Amino acid sequence: FYSGVFAPSTLDIGSPNDLSGMTVGVTGGSLEDLEITEAAPSDAKIVRFGDNAATLSAFTSGQVQVLVTGNTAAASLTEADPKLDLERKYIVKDSPCFIGIKKGNEDLLRWVNVFILHKKLGGNLNAISQKWLGQDLPPLPSL
């Protein structure tokens, strides 16, 4: 999972400096809000919305030029409307997914590790990541 800057393919954006003069939509108080507020130039107009649904709606209705959100939220837009011109411009913050297992639960730990290894060796683990997270897996640690 990651938070990113998304916009139409016609906008040339590769870094926070490229947001100069643009209207940027973000969910107020979110991690994305904190990151983009710190990184964006002072003349970028950051518009904060009350929740993700309002933020996504603001982008699709043209209220903002640029969307800052999680990759799964952005993927939901293009899934709902495959004709929507929306591409990732850059990653704001990478947020790897982890699983916690109660200390001492060796059976579950072994099961999870074997499942991951089986899917990785079978070539299916990256496909699962693509399906649910919309991105390739990062390099995995050795088991």
Which ranges hold each PLM region?
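Hydrophobic residues within well-ordered alpha-helices
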Residues: 19, 58-60, 99, 112
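A ligand-binding cleft/hinge motif common to bilobed small-molecule-binding domains
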Residues: 35-38, 53, 60-61, 65-93
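Flexible hinge/capping segments at coil-to-helix
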Residues: 7-24
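Beta->alpha turn/N-cap motifs
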Residues: 1, 9, 29-31, 51-52, ...
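Periplasmic-binding protein-like
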Residues: 1-9, 75-117, 135-143
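Ligand-binding clefts/hinges and TM-proximal coupling segments of bilobed small-molecule sensing domains
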Residues: 31-48, 85-88, 116-143
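Short, well-ordered beta-strand segments
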Residues: 23-26, 67, 100
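Conserved functional loop/turn residues at catalytic and ligand-binding sites
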Residues: 23, 63, 132, 136
